[in-house]
Amino acid sequence: MEKKVIIKKLMLTFVVSLLSLASFAQDANDYFVRGAKVYIESNNENVIEHSNDKILLWGYWKTVNSKEQADFILNLDANFSIFYTINAQAITKDNKIIKRFKSKNSFKSLDANPKRGAVKALFDKEIIPFTHGLY
């Protein structure tokens, strides 16, 4: 009889622990809300500038000038090999990956400016559809 009570208490403790862990877990829905503040970092200043412009035109997020002000960080790694390709991931301020986006290249958008074209392709084909698909 006493054994059953101990088992029930242990099970209850376990369930409460799981519920509390689940309540603290965050996913993309929690970060990618309208009005979220994003800090953009990249190995290329022009990619940062074009991304800021694209986010401003989109009007869904707001860009900030420091990681401390941001809700999340958008890391954009630009590489050139025939076309500009951007590998993107959204990360938390403590460097946990929220979402990795498929890499996009400047060929996809046929823009005269290859960096701007790669940014445009990334946002138009990956980031914006993913974000709007969450809600």
Regions found by a protein language model. Name each.
Residues 42-44, 77-78:
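Generic secondary-structure microfeatures
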Residues 1-7:
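N-terminal secretory signal peptides that target proteins for export/translocation
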Residues 9-22:
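Bacterial N-terminal signal peptides
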Residues 26-37, 44-54, 58, 96-135:
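C-terminal/domain-edge helix-coil "capping" segments
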Residues 61-71:
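Short acidic low-complexity segments
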Residues 37-40, 65, 75:
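Structural recognition of the beta-strand scaffold that forms the well-ordered cores
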